[in-house]
Amino acid sequence: MKKNEEYIVACIDDTDLNSGVVKIDDMVVFVPNLLIGEKAKIKIVKVNKKYAFGIIIELLKPSINRQELTCEVAKTCGGCQLQHMSYAYQLDYKYKHVKKLFEGIEVKPILGMDNPWYYRNKAQFPVKIKDGKVQMGFYRQHSNDVVTCKECKIQDHVINEVFSFIQKKITLKMAQDLRHVFIRHSSTDEIQVVFIGKNEKNIVSLSDQLKNTFANITSIVFNYNTRNDNVILGDTYKVLYGNDYIIEECLGNKVKLHFKAFFQVNPKQMEVLYSQAIKAANLTGNETCIDMYAGTGTIGMAVSQHAKSVIGVEIVKEAVDNANDNTKMNHLDHCHYVCQDATDFAHDHKEDKIDVIFIDPPRKGMTENGIKDTITMQPDKIVYVSCNPKTLSRDLKIFKEYGYQCEYVQPVDMFCQTIGLECVAKLTKIV
């Protein structure tokens, strides 16, 4: 087999990264976007010792699970890897692959959306100048080239409206000082726009146009970033209009959301996810709970409505200050947050009676030391919320070595049209 050779193939399997699997003379070939059962003409683009990669040249026999692409940049933008699949098939596809990861553990049916479009509450648009024209949109897959577009079909309609307005009004002079434009639209109908770049001088007039056009813009910020790497946000900023935060809402609690703070991008499914986490804890109202990796306190505040007390632990001081502001705003006297390293906190509280620990770590999951810290407090139950099924699977094995087994995993489709998936895992002590 050589590069640029063409073959007629039939897809026999798929991977969790959206590649079809075909075999040519006992050589496995991975073909992006090819569905099981499809027949296609492909071209080989890379050959390794034991496997190769191909691309579809012509689809000869499409699957009944394939749908027409409705997005004008779906083939070039790296955002939506699964848009060619019907939504029902996306759920089946994700469920199949997540079930493989958790052998011997019950995996409950995946919870999807009624409408899997226009759901995201946050967008980051890179800004570049090419051939004397401003480019705004999304990065091409595996590239720093910008794919321009009129709208994004998984972004909230209001975000698309603000994005379209900025595209029409931005000048070359404005764009030369920018790296990104960041737009948020909250479930309370507040809009935040953050310009990221080296100088705000040329952006002030655009800021004025935005606030005069969109009545529900409550925050416009310029974030200074002169770095030469891929980090989006810089350390310093200036408020051009309103506040440096917007008000969000989750399960009845208001959340003061600073533009640097993490918040789930799918508000409807976030409530499904956190409701499943609370359900897994099986709370009676008498429990003492810990919210590890607490961030701005969203999970802990939701839990506090069903528990006796909640302590949130977070190492970032600004996030802790925000979380405590949020508890005051929602009159949650039995929920508070501390700024402390997780190891120190665990050892300070190892003699306390902790009923449930909620964990929501970043994509890389937990370290073994982090897992040891968690079980130092000997909770009756652990509820692990994960945005990466692979690191969750790894961590559940380590928890089992230290005496906690997983009863079940509940997948939630938070990132429709993409390969992303959230999961809630319920762990209990091995008796």
Where are the regions a protein language model picked out?
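Internal alpha/beta scaffold segment
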Residues: 146-179, 185-187, 199-221
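Short, acidic/hydrophobic/Gly-rich beta-strand patch recurrent on exposed beta strands
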Residues: 20-25, 137-141, 323
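Terminal RNA-binding accessory module
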Residues: 1-69, 73, 336-337
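Short, solvent-exposed loop/turn elements at beta->coil junctions and helix N-caps
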Residues: 109-116, 179-184, 410-414
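A short, glycine/Asx- and small/polar-enriched loop/turn
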Residues: 117-121, 187-190, 419-422
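Extended interfacial segments that mediate partner engagement and assembly in macromolecular machines
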Residues: 57-69, 75-176
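Short, aliphatic-rich beta-strand segments
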Residues: 189-198, 254-258
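Rossmann-like S-adenosyl-L-methionine
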Residues: 2-8, 14-18, 172, 201-431
